[in-house]
């Protein structure tokens, strides 16, 4: 019971036993992100209970961002990324199974390949597998495989490798599925009077910080310009980062092509062609 006699509110997610996502994976991912809170990182949804089929979290009301909340999120996200990871594709430290992003599989790299740059990781682990999956569902245009193969050659050669933001280590600790729906802003009525952001539903791994920022842009996060400006002020992004946004969006768009079909396959190929 709360101090006023009210029953604390919770939210329980139910998971399919046959799906790729797993409540214990999500709990481990949330815990890994939450480690950065003590250093000023973004607030993460609190896990209250986890089983093989359910995950119970604090109830998280969502509202319109309060004044300054977008800027606070940008600064805090930079610190979450700065918490780092051992290598690209690194899983949460308390997880040894497969990964997932929504209802799609997501590979982890349990042992870091020597001198594995971001571009090679991105093509090998985040693009090529989803080209195969999307093709299995006939979700890509006829030229899709060839377009991604050509882009893969450039990625593997390191042509799009870029430094992390200033505060981040060589590998950032990223949310991994940071679209607007996984970003909640607590309203002024929040129990603690806190009006900042809370992150939910991660696909946490070692990655490039620009991937999370590109995901925020993909489906239109609220007050995106303020979030990005505050992030850049706290942890300056590498030169030319706006030109790489669409490159980092390729993975989630391919995931959508695999899961939902429709126009996502064509969108993925159009984005890829920008980098040929």
Model-derived features with residue positions:
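Domain-level recognition of nuclease-like catalytic cores that cleave nucleotide substrates
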Residues: 65-73, 122, 263, 267-270
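An alpha-helical support segment within catalytic cores of ATP-dependent transferases
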Residues: 85-175, 186-194
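Hydrophobic alpha-helical segments that form the core
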Residues: 246-254
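ATP-binding pocket architecture of kinase catalytic cores
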Residues: 8-117
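ATP/Mg2+ or Mg2+-diphosphate-binding catalytic cores
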Residues: 256-276
């Amino acid at each position: 019971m709360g101090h006023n006699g009210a029953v604390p509110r919770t939210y329980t997610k139910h998971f399919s036993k046959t799906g790729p996502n797993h409540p214990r994976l999500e709990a481990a991912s949330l815990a890994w992100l939450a480690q950065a809170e003590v250093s000023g990182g973004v607030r993460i949804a609190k896990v209250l209970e986890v089983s093989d089929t359910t995950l119970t979290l604090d109830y998280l009301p969502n509202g319109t961002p309060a004044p300054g909340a977008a800027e606070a999120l940008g600064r805090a996200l930079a610190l979450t990324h700065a918490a780092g990871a051992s290598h690209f594709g690194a899983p949460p430290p308390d997880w040894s199974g497969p990964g997932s992003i929504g209802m799609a599989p997501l590979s982890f790299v349990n042992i870091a390949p020597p001198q594995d740059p971001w571009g090679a990781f991105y093509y090998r682990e985040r693009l090529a597998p989803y080209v195969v999956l999307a093709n299995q569902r006939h979700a890509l245009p006829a030229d899709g495989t060839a377009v991604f193969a050509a882009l893969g050659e450039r990625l593997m050669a390191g042509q799009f490798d870029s430094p992390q933001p200033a505060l981040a280590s060589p590998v950032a600790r990223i949310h991994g599925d940071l679209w607007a729906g996984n970003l909640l802003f607590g309203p002024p009525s929040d129990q603690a009077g806190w009006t900042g952001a809370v992150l939910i539903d991660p696909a946490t791994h070692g990655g490039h910080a620009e991937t999370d920022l590109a995901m925020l842009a993909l489906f239109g996060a609220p007050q995106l310009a303020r979030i990005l400006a505050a992030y850049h002020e706290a942890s300056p992004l590498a030169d030319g980062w706006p030109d790489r946004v669409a490159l980092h969006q390729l993975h989630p768009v391919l995931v959508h092509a695999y899961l939902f079909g429709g126009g996502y396959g064509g969108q993925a190929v159009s984005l890829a062609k920008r980098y040929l």
